Amino acid sequence: DIDVTAGGVELSRLFAADNIAGFVDIPGVNPNSVLVRVSGDSMTPLVPDGAYIAIRKVELSSSIMWGHVYVVVTDDYRMVKRIRKNVDPCCVTLHSENPQYDDIDMPVADIRAIFIVETVIDCRRL
């Protein structure tokens, strides 16, 4: 398992350095997507702590769909957040679903990669 955070835990390794535990075939999930587990409650109730998300890498410069949920990778973190347009064109706003968390104004230059969240799988509800 590898985790992304919904709350701001420090990044310890990149996806490429992780070992693949296996493969799954889930109806409605793109077979090219990667499944990762979410730790933290900043995206609750949309993405609860312990849920799995199917993510697919996209290009930051051309593929942002404002208001959609992404995994944002920086040098220090990989976070699940809703990306919103910022008044400063050099930044994006990272928004949490949980109102207990403040928005983060993130310089685009600090973002190393983004992955769109395609599906949320909450195993506790299965």
Which role fits each region the language model picked out?
Residues 55-56, 72:
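A generic structural signal for residues embedded in beta-strands
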Residues 71-92:
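Short peripheral tails and domain-boundary helices/loops at the edges of structured domains
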Residues 21-22, 29, 88-90, 110:
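Conserved binding/catalytic microenvironments
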Residues 1-49, 59-62, 123-126:
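Short, positionally conserved secondary-structure boundary motifs
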Residues 91-126:
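Amphipathic alpha-helical interface segments
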